[in-house]
């Protein structure tokens, strides 16, 4: 059996990057059941709301208008869940592009900086399957959430 000699460091191979973010803490949230995922986003919103309320209370205008204070605090505290979603989106899009690519761009210290290595056909097929059946649904789910937040 021919063993493929790959110059790409293990940590920079798309399949290993996929496994790495799949096991990371915040980036892996979209892999959870939807109700657990939404609950985590809700908890992040609830966590930051008191901090936002304290910051908003520093305004003389808002201190005298309680309804405005609450509305602005609740709205501004949405920043944390949106940042978390953005981070997840960027990570999954990056992995999706790396898995779909025919070549692997990698960096290695020394004289191999900025190298490109063409994936063998069997690697490409495996990466495409992972991209289409595991990563694409996550991206679509995050896209749906972003579209909902725009309303």
What are these regions (language model features)?
Residues 2-26, 88-133:
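Membrane-proximal soluble regions of multi-pass membrane proteins
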Residues 57-69:
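Membrane-interfacial hairpin junctions
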Residues 6-59:
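Cytosolic-side membrane-entry/anchor segment at the start of a transmembrane helix
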Residues 31-42, 119-150:
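Loop-to-transmembrane boundary segments
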Residues 45-48, 68-98:
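Hydrophobic alpha-helical membrane-embedded segments
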């Amino acid at each position: 059996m021919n063993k493929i000699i790959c110059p790409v460091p293990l940590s920079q191979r798309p399949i290993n990057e996929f496994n790495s973010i799949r096991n990371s803490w915040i980036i892996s949230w979209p892999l959870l059941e939807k109700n657990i995922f939404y609950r985590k986003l809700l908890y992040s919103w609830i966590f930051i709301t008191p901090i936002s309320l304290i910051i908003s209370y520093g305004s003389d205008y808002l201190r005298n208008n309680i309804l405005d204070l609450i509305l602005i605090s609740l709205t501004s505290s949405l920043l944390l869940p949106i940042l978390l979603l953005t981070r997840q989106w960027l990570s999954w899009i990056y992995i999706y592009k790396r898995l779909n690519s025919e070549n692997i761009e990698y960096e290695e210290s020394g004289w191999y900086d900025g190298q490109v290595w063409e994936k063998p056909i069997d690697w490409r097929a495996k990466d495409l399957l992972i991209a289409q059946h595991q990563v694409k649904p996550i991206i679509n789910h995050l896209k749906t959430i972003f579209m909902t937040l725009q309303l």
